[in-house]
């Protein structure tokens, strides 16, 4: 059976840490920003981690 190809769209959006977790950017950052408080925008700058329920699927998409 051939190797699975990496989905380039997913590879651009997710990065793997050395410990094996998957990092992602926060949603709600680029649109309607003036309506958000400075605190909200500051917290959205920080990367989040992929939730355990999505982990297996995302890992398959970015498999190398």
From Swiss-Prot:
InterPro entries: Ribosomal_bL35, Ribosomal_bL35-like, Ribosomal_bL35_CS, Ribosomal_bL35_sf. PANTHER family: 54S RIBOSOMAL PROTEIN BL35M, LARGE RIBOSOMAL SUBUNIT PROTEIN BL35M. Residues 1-26 have a biased composition (Basic residues). Residues 1-46 are annotated as: Disordered. One of its GO terms (biological process) is translation. It comes from the Bacteria. The keyword Ribonucleoprotein applies. One of its GO terms (cellular component) is cytosolic large ribosomal subunit. This is Large ribosomal subunit protein bL35. Belongs to the bacterial ribosomal protein bL35 family. Keywords: Ribonucleoprotein, Ribosomal protein. GO terms for molecular function: structural constituent of ribosome. It holds the Pfam family Ribosomal_L35p. The lineage of its organism: Bacteria, Bacillati, Mycoplasmatota, Mycoplasmoidales, Mycoplasmoidaceae.
